[in-house]
Amino acid sequence: MHYVKDTKELIEICSKLQKSKILSIDTEFIREKTYWPKLCLIQVYNGFEKIIIDPLSSDIDLKPFFKILNNKEILKIFHSGRQDIEIFYNLTKKIPKNVYDTQIAAMVCGFGESVGYESLVSQILGRKIDKSSRLTNWSNRPLSSKQIDYAITDVTHLYDICLLYTSPSPRDSSK
């Protein structure tokens, strides 16, 4: 797992991520006392590398990551991504390109209008997830190992769910 705290490391990671076909992305933020959410963490997974980007680090410029968000060749996976996309839009004035929302996909597949992430992971992957860190203060540093585990687990499950939804079914494999 990579914990990215500076621009140099972010540039290196993003050059690798630019070669990815699919990225699952999630954010942690605080929205209690502000109109716009305060971005506290970005989690990314490409099927091989688990990455946490710390936007609160004083030595980081997120522009290399923002280029990835606007790369039309890379599928970006979110679950109920409205707030994540809102955060990125407020920072860049651009909407990420080529977005796949697992909540919308689940609705189309009959899971209900707003199936929660925990329920979706349980129903599709048969896995239980620990959501106890969801409402912790994500702006405090250093993050605990429990917070980091929670954050990175979210994007790994997202990736797996997307692969199941987008893989051809057995009867389609002959086409």
What is each residue range found by the language model?
Residues 2-5, 9-11, 17-25, 30-164:
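Conserved DEDDh/DEDDy metal-dependent 3′-5′ exonuclease domain
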Residues 173-175:
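N-terminal low-complexity segments that are often proline-rich with Ser/Thr-Pro
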Residues 165-170:
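Conserved small/polar residues in nucleotide/adenosyl-binding loops
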